[in-house]
Curated annotation (Swiss-Prot):
Keyword Transmembrane: yes
Record organism: Burkholderia pseudomallei (strain 1026b)
Pfam families for the chain: A24_N_bact, Peptidase_A24
Keyword Membrane: yes
Swiss-Prot/TrEMBL catalytic activity: Typically cleaves a -Gly-|-Phe- bond to release an N-terminal, basic peptide of 5-8 residues from type IV prepilin, and then N-methylates the new N-terminal amino group, the methyl donor being S-adenosyl-L-methionine
Keyword entries, A-Z: Cell inner membrane, Cell membrane, Hydrolase, Membrane, Metal-binding, Methyltransferase, Multifunctional enzyme, Protease, S-adenosyl-L-methionine, Transferase, Transmembrane, Transmembrane helix, Zinc
Superkingdom of origin: Bacteria
Stated name of the protein: Prepilin leader peptidase/N-methyltransferase
Cofactor(s) required for function per UniProt: Zn(2+)
Upper classification of the organism: Bacteria, Pseudomonadati, Pseudomonadota, Betaproteobacteria, Burkholderiales
Amino acid sequence: MPTASMTPNPFLSGSPEHAAAAGPLAAFAALPTGMQLAFAIVLGLVVGSFLNVVVHRLPIMMKRAWLAEIAEATGAPCADDSLPARYNLCVPRSACPHCGHALRAWENVPVLSYIALRGRCRHCRTPIGARYPLIELASGALAAGALALFGPSGAALAAFGLCAALLAMSAIDMQTGFLPDSLTLPLLWAGLCVNLWGTFASLRAAVIGAIAGYLFLWCILWLFKLLRGIEGIGYGDLKLLAALGAWLGWEALPQVVLIAAVAGAAVGLVATWRGRMRFEEPLPFGPFLAAGGAATLFFGTPFYLLLGG
């Protein structure tokens, strides 16, 4: 819960009383509710389109950096020279990953372009993964949810930023099995900065949450390693739970972990029962932590309280 402070909270300044200080946010707050919601959905769709770029390119960029470091250390030529010299989240233009056809502007329109193209590349007719419209739609829904919960305020923007990062990290974890430090660590620091004003938790609770989140899964990791001889959880998951603790405070961590554990176990059992995976096969835990964090952000801690927490 946000705590009272003598310093005005810039993340909660969407009300008319703060209109003079809110700048563009005040103009947005003055719009009819329907227009606010429509704008939030469009913003979410656009951000979702960019998240697809992050999900596709960031693992490639990291792999390229690793190969370059190996080549530098060993003196061998870089093993991957198939990409352009400049390859990042901004350049080159988006292209079909199969044929390399550069996408036109209208082919980048979120969701609608997927429908217009009937889910296939216009050039090579290779099917486009359903992940692209799903991430865009999820991002739009999360933006609308943040606006509905927090109103036209900086808190809504911060909440949507958290959800967008969780969405991208979940997709990357499902695709590659790892959570990039370039996303988890900035998310942790962002949570501490946002809670300087007690936006989602007091700063004290946020700092304790970051420490407790990391140490809790660290203990689980080493306990599993002592009992089974293997690491049952990745270090990226430790950093993600620390980031969620920094955003939501230590009080929210039991519910986040509970939701993640129950959802992960349920999905794992169903996937094993249907033959989609072997019992001993690892299941990425990041998406379930992200789901627990998002559920706690939007709904508070009623599930934990119902269980007697």
